[in-house]
Amino acid sequence: YWLAKNDKKYSNCYELLDEWMQHFSYGIISASVSLAEERGACDAYADTRWAEGKLPKDMTTPMYDSLFNYEEKLDWTSLRARIAKYGVRNASMIAMFPAETSAKISGSGTTNGIEPIRELIISKGGKNRQAKFVVPELARLKDKYDRIWDHTSCEALIKTYAVIQRYTDQAISVNTYYNKQ
C-alpha cells in the first residue's frame, strides 16, 4: 500500500524505501536506548553486536554498497554514542516478514507485509472460514499496485528486500515467485 500511495513499484522504490527504513530503524533503536536509560540494558547486552558498537546498517556487504549508495539522513553517530553509554533494552528489535501469503489482517487499511500483493481482491481463510481482502483505496490506486505476478524476474523484489535488510537486526524470510510468461 505504501508503495502504491507513493507512486512507486518494487523496481524504482529503493531510495525512498531507504529513507523510510532509516527513520523506522532509528526510531526503534532510539526507543530501546531510552528504555535502557530508564530501566537498564538487557541482560545479554554485553554479548550483542550492539555492545560492539555495531548497528544493523553497518552489516552491509561490498555488493550492497555497489548497488545502493544513499545519503544518511539521520544522526547515527549520536545514536551510537547513546548506545555506548546506556546500552539497549532489547537485544533483538526489528524483524520483517513477507506475510502476503499467510497474514490475515482485515480492515486495517494496509496490505500484509513487505512482499507484493497477489491480487487486488483475494479470498483467504482456513477450512471453516473464508474472508475477502481488498487492497486499501482500490478505486484510486488500482493501477499503482505492484502485483507479484506482474514480475517476470525476482531482481526488483530481492533488491527491495536488501534495502529493508540493511536496517533490520534479524534475517528476513523471503518468498520468491516465478511467472513463466
Where are these regions (language model features)?
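Catalytic alpha/beta core of large soluble enzyme barrels
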Residues: 37, 41, 58, 65-73, ...
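Extended, well-ordered alpha-helical scaffold/bundle regions in very large, multi-domain proteins
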Residues: 1-63
